[in-house]
Amino acid sequence: MERVNLFFLHGFLGRPSDWAVVKAHLPQHDGLRIFTPDYFKDASLGPQHTFEEWAGNFIKLVEAHGCAGERNILIGYSLGGRLALHALEKKPALWYKTILVSTNPGFNDPHESFDPISEERRQRWMNDSYWAEEFLKAPWETVLRNWNAQPVFGGGETEPLRIEKEYSRETLSLALTQWSLAQQKNMRSLIQKNIQKVIWMVGERDEKFMEMSRRLQEEVQGLRLETVPASSHRVLFDSPKDLGERIRQLIQQLL
């Protein structure tokens, strides 16, 4: 029997511990291995690397764990979902399934990275650059309060307590520009090519991402879209038991 390997990628400001409740709902089985890399602490996975460089380094990490040829499932939340898309692009055959939670597929345009000719990308770049400066210099409590007050995070639980000493401000700041949505290419064709591998999850109270996901269903034929009840953008914190149960059902048939 092939082993099943789960790789969880947290979001911006995230920690591996964010997945604790999800992991608690998964079966205890000798054939199941769980990995929760901390890409803000691992130099090979940090934002000093571009999306493409990051994907190459992440694939090396996965293969170093002896996972090639096994059932590998990649679960990414928010920024972690966008990174997961690049890992899927880098080596599709490595992944049995990719679960993308509260994930943005990128602007629906032909640009490969930031291009000021795109008004959408220019506006996003300006916004992310503002936050990069805030995370670098503003008082920690102030920047966290303002970050959490953004409309996209409304209607749900706040994140766990984030303690300044557990982070490098320089790393957080760099992540906001290096991995800005303005730098990300359109991933719709990738999703279409790997449609059998992709599970797209979104919280039903996440108005922005619900609308985006419905459009994505029209743009990508056969997309498996799962709506998580009573959840905002922060599905991971609003409904970790629900998320864990969905993953459990997926892997139960493989063990």
PLM segments and residue spans:
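Flexible "cap/lid" loop of the alpha/beta hydrolase fold
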Residues: 89, 97-134
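Conserved alpha/beta-hydrolase "acid-adjacent" motif
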Residues: 207-212
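Short beta-strand/loop motif that positions the catalytic acidic residue
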Residues: 194, 200-202
